[in-house]
UniProtKB/Swiss-Prot annotation:
This is Sodium/potassium exporting P-type ATPase 1. GO terms for cellular component: plasma membrane. It catalyses: Na(+)(in) + ATP + H2O = Na(+)(out) + ADP + phosphate + H(+); K(+)(in) + ATP + H2O = K(+)(out) + ADP + phosphate + H(+). GO terms for biological process: potassium ion export across plasma membrane; sodium ion transport. Its main location: membrane. Residues 1-57, 104-247, 295-717, 765-799, 862-885, 938-951 are cytoplasmic. InterPro entries: ATPase_P-typ_cation-transptr_C, ATPase_P-typ_cation-transptr_N, ATPase_P-typ_cyto_dom_N, ATPase_P-typ_P_site, ATPase_P-typ_TM_dom_sf, ATPase_P-typ_transduc_dom_A_sf, HAD-like_sf, HAD_sf. Its cofactor is Mg(2+). It comes from Marchantia polymorpha. ATP binds at T332, E414, K467, R511, T575, G576, D577, R636, K642, N664. The chain crosses the membrane at residues 58-78, 83-103, 248-268, 274-294, 718-738, 744-764, 800-820, 841-861, 886-906, 917-937.
Length: 951
């Protein structure tokens, strides 16, 4: 193989390209050589897409407001010769940065891996088989298969095209899609835009299908040469992260104000003791472990969702999911199984219908009318029946290798039609010797139909096969009667008859396709097929009949929709189906429900539960806004209608999730608050989304919403836990300014290292445990959260619990020093220089540190539920006390951690500025019990006074 990335491939013939690259257009590369080629040419990636930069992650650990305060405190401590405290602060910073770096780096790597899993894929032929691989695995020589909506994975020389058009705007600036060909382009100076036999990496297929040979990959592609990609290369901070960063800098400002207050109270004497007191206040303001805990919790949430088939591409989705009020879902493959089956056929003039048996993709089945079996050959003797089945097989791009083993490829609707043909031994392969494919007019949302043109070798004629929605009837002007084509005598009667049958089938929950065909002589076709416009081909068609396709709802869809309604989430179904088909499926899965106290399913509690796209789009924005409720179902939905639906929801201040899989769904996915792409959907849809569902299942969306709510609820829990502790510490230190020694210097009740020990060592583990708390039973039984992270109740809880802690700790301080002590605050007790003078103060510090640690550990159980008592199961009573093992161990071990700091010599006096205690333990126990009962009293007041849900 020659240098694959350096040849003028557009000037070579297909045979020359395959020879130069050592590949085969039918069988592709051998797997045995792929590894060697990957080593030779490297991964098919742009440099900007390569992983996570560890240096940026490390730098981020030192640039947030919380760490800045600790760095300043460290510098100040060393400046006043308090090396012990400065050393501890430096250790805390390094430890915190290390933990943060490891966890954030892992989180970024996880997100990077998930983005790659949801990144563009490529369908390649290797060793004669068709495989879907990740785009980075493509190598020069790979045979790539393209379909509408695909993002081209590499620069490719085309070898087969069917109506292929590509959007190259991001590469060439050409605003219109470019029609492609396979003929060699002569001329050395052909520009990228003139190389019509080439498709380029990152461009998008907008029409048709084809095959190509990968000739350049990675940075050797045209897009690589200009180092530009449509794929994302980075991940910006989420709104929550931005809010928390803002909070950090607000706290930084508060710490500066508090430092000024300390100096002002002490008449701006900048001696060592006063400076250390200011440092203590600065440290007390900061919940040091907050950012790391949030990062870890969100990373665990991403992994948990990935294990349940939901790949999170952007962290913002985790925050957005908890606020979702409306879900706009596709039907096919999402609410339903996606394994469509043809169950009904109808021919013009029939009073009954043909029923076709067989489940899913089984290629065996029987034909019956009114449950009476009919011989297949007898049916095929009717030219209308035979042509209808022939159209099902040939107006079709699906391939079936072994349906029973799931070896099928193509659109679910087309697979169903192909399976029908196989049941009657008329699959596409049976026509290969007689029918030569010429061109394809693919399905589009505008025409809502698809046609394929074949040349009948035996008859020297051309045949056009068409299938699609009801509007196919508009291009039909003939019927088959007794094997002869006749013009439709009465257009009105014809339309009325067929429309009535469509409605009957639609009410059975069937998707109905209209099937038609046309024969054109070779003489007429000699006008040059390639120049025929679609409008000229799809006319004067002969109507053959109707095909009814059943797409069985997933068993879990009804349960998931019920969960949404319990959670205050409205589900909308946006489908391309007929009005009555959509209505039948919507009732079956529970989207449309009978009015309360009504046994009649046709009576629903709203005036317009189902609208067609035409009806919805005919309304102005003002008329849509005047509707009491938006429709639950939109039938015959188009991508443009999806966008209008999202806009209408936004005008009503709703928070919407939207599903999609096609290239035309990208605008609505981007417009939605949460875009959810299907794993089997187009690459463009995936890149426009925040979440990709690998199982295409509606129940997975509901799981994701539940997980988003769980994560959001847990973040509120541990923020409440951490910040209320900080409030208590600040209260103690602010009021502590009033306690002055003989020199008039304020004596801090809590030393800086004590505060760091509480905030980092004993407070962070239970906060982490709260972050992984299991979802409560009412997670999906309350309306969506719309008040943000810091609602009024959360802020009130932070202040009340902080005030309770701070007040009890101050009482303990006063009791140890004044009630049972010598009432002396000593001299220079903010340092360890005068230990003999500071025994009482140091014992008081030990007492209040242990008491505060035990309070904050007990407070973790308070935070599990905002109002429920600890005596109840809901609030974490006996039945739930040990349900969160991480929390149990955090509390048990945390309660023992202060003991060594109190009793180990030198560590207690030199580092923690405290002393051993004895009888003071009784004060600790009493104050912790008091905190427990005061917390219960506060919750009791909330339960009796506040009747609304948590805000």
């Amino acid at each position: 193989m020659m240098g694959a990335n350096s040849t003028e491939w557009h000037g070579q013939s297909v045979e020359q390209v395959t020879e130069l690259l050592g590949t085969d257009v039918e069988r592709g590369l051998k797997e045995s050589v792929v590894g060697q080629l990957q080593k030779q040419f490297g991964p098919n990636e742009l440099k900007g897409q390569r992983g996570v930069n560890p240096w940026k992650v490390l730098l981020a650990q030192f640039t947030n407001g919380l760490t800045v305060i600790l760095l300043i405190a460290t510098v100040v401590s060393f400046a006043v010769q308090d090396h012990a405290e400065g050393g501890v602060l430096a250790f805390v910073i390094i430890f915190n940065a290390s933990v943060g770096f490891v966890q954030e780096y892992r989180a970024e790597k996880t997100m990077d891996a998930l983005r790659r899993m949801a990144s563009p894929t490529a369908k390649v032929i290797r060793d004669g088989g068709l495989d879907r691989i990740s785009s980075p695995g493509v190598v020069p020589g790979d045979i790539i298969v393209f379909e509408v909506g695909d993002v081209v994975p590499a620069d490719c020389r085309l070898i087969e095209v069917l109506n292929l058009e590509v959007d190259e705007a991001m590469l060439t600036g050409e605003s219109l899609p470019v029609a492609k060909t396979v003929e060699a382009i002569k001329g050395e100076n052909a520009t990228v835009g003139d190389r019509l036999n080439m498709v380029y990496s990152s461009t998008i297929l907008t029409k048709g299908r084809g095959k190509g040979i990968a000739v350049a990959t990675g940075m050797s592609t045209e897009i690589g040469k200009i180092t530009k990609s449509i794929s994302e290369t980075g991940q910006s901070s989420t709104p929550m992260q931005k809010r928390l960063n803002r909070m950090a800098y607000i706290l930084f400002g508060i710490s500066l104000v508090l430092a000024v207050i300390v100096f002002a109270v002490n008449k701006f004497e900048f001696n060592t003791d006063i400076i250390i007191y200011a440092v203590s206040l600065g440290i007390a303001v900061i919940p040091e472990g907050l950012i790391a805990v949030i990062t870890i919790v969100m990373a665990l949430g991403v992994r948990r969702m990935a294990s349940q088939q939901a790949l999170v591409r952007k962290l913002v989705a985790l925050e957005s999911l908890q606020a979702v009020t409306n879900i706009c879902s596709d039907k096919t493959g999402t609410l339903t199984q996606g394994k469509m089956t043809v169950t009904t056929l109808w021919l013009p003039g029939m009073e009954d219908q043909y029923s076709i048996s067989g489940n899913g993709w089984e290629t065996s089945g029987e034909i019956s009318v009114r449950e009476q079996p009919i011989d297949a050959q007898e049916c095929l003797s009717d030219l209308r029946f035979r042509l209808l089945v022939e159209c099902s097989a040939l107006c079709n791009t699906a391939n079936i290798v072994e349906a029973s083993e799931g070896k099928v490829w193509g659109d679910p609707t087309e697979i169903a039609l192909q399976v029908l043909a196989y049941k009657l031994q008329m699959g596409k392969p049976s026509f290969r010797s007689r029918k030569e494919p010429i061109t394809e007019y693919p399905f589009s949302s505008a025409e809502k139909r698809m046609s394929m043109l074949y040349r009948d070798v035996e008859r020297d004629a051309f045949e056009i096969y068409t299938k699609g929605a009801e509007n196919v009837l508009a291009i039909c002007d003939r019927l088959l009667e007794k094997g002869e084509e006749v013009e439709i005598s009465s257009r009105d009667e014809f339309m009325q008859s067929v429309s009535a049958q469509i409605q009957i089938m639609a009410k059975q929950g069937l998707r109905v396709l209209v099937v038609a065909y046309r024969t054109v002589s070779e003489k007429e076709m000699a006008k040059s097929v390639s120049k025929w416009e679609r409008v000229d081909v799809e006319r004067n068609m002969t109507f053959l009949g109707l095909v009814g396709i059943r797409d069985t709802p997933r068993p879990e869809s009804r349960i998931a929709v019920d969960q949404c309604y319990e959670a205050g989430i409205i589900v909308h179904m946006l489908t391309g189906d007929h009005h009555d088909t959509a209505l039948a499926i919507a009732r079956e899965v529970g989207i449309i429900r009978p009015a309360p106290n009504s046994a009649d399913e046709s009576v629903v509690p709203m005036s317009n539960p189902v609208m067609t796209a035409a009806e919805f789009d005919a309304l102005s924005e003002e008329q849509i806004d005047d509707l009491n409720e938006l429709p639950l179902v939109i039938a015959r939905c188009t991508p443009a209608t999806k966008v209008r639906m999202i806009e209408a929801l936004h005008r009503r201040k709703k928070f919407a999730a939207m599903t999609g899989d096609g290239v035309n769904d990208a605008p609505s996915l981007k417009k939605a608050d949460v875009g959810i792409a299907m794993g089997a959907g187009s690459d463009v849809a995936k890149q426009s989304s925040e979440i990709v569902l690998t199982d295409n299942n509606f129940a997975t969306i509901v799981m994701a919403v539940s997980e988003g709510r769980r994560i959001f609820s847990n973040i509120r829990k541990f923020i409440l836990h951490l910040v209320s502790t900080n409030v208590g510490e600040v209260i103690v230190l602010i009021i502590g300014l009033a306690f002055k020694d003989r020199n008039g210097v304020s004596v801090f009740p809590l030393a800086p290292v004590q505060i760091l020990f509480m905030n980092m060592v004993t407070s962070t583990p239970p906060a982490m445990a709260l972050g992984v708390e299991a979802a409560s039973k009412d997670t999906m039984k309350v309306p969506p959260h719309t008040k943000g992270l810091f609602g009024k109740e959360v802020l009130a809880d932070m202040m009340v619990y902080g005030i309770i802690m701070g007040s009890l700790i101050l009482v303990d301080w006063v009791l140890v020093i004044y009630a049972f002590g010598d009432s002396q605050l000593g001299l220079e007790c903010n340092s360890d220089r005068m230990l003999n003078e500071c025994n009482t103060v140091f014992r008081a510090r030990s007492t209040i540190m242990v008491a505060l640690i035990w309070m904050l550990l007990l407070h973790a159980y308070n935070c599990r539920h905002p109002r429920a008592s600890l005596f109840t199961a809901e609030g974490g009573g006996a039945s739930k006390l040990f349900s969160n093992r991480l929390l149990v161990w955090s509390v048990l071990l945390g309660s023992l951690m202060p003991i060594p700091t109190v009793y180990i010599p030198t560590l207690n006096t030199k580092i923690f500025k405290q002393e051993t205690i004895s009888w003071e333990w009784s004060i600790v126990v009493v104050s912790v019990v008091a905190f427990f009962f005061l917390s219960e009293l506060y919750k009791l007041i909330k339960r009796n006074v506040m009747t609304s849900r948590v805000i």
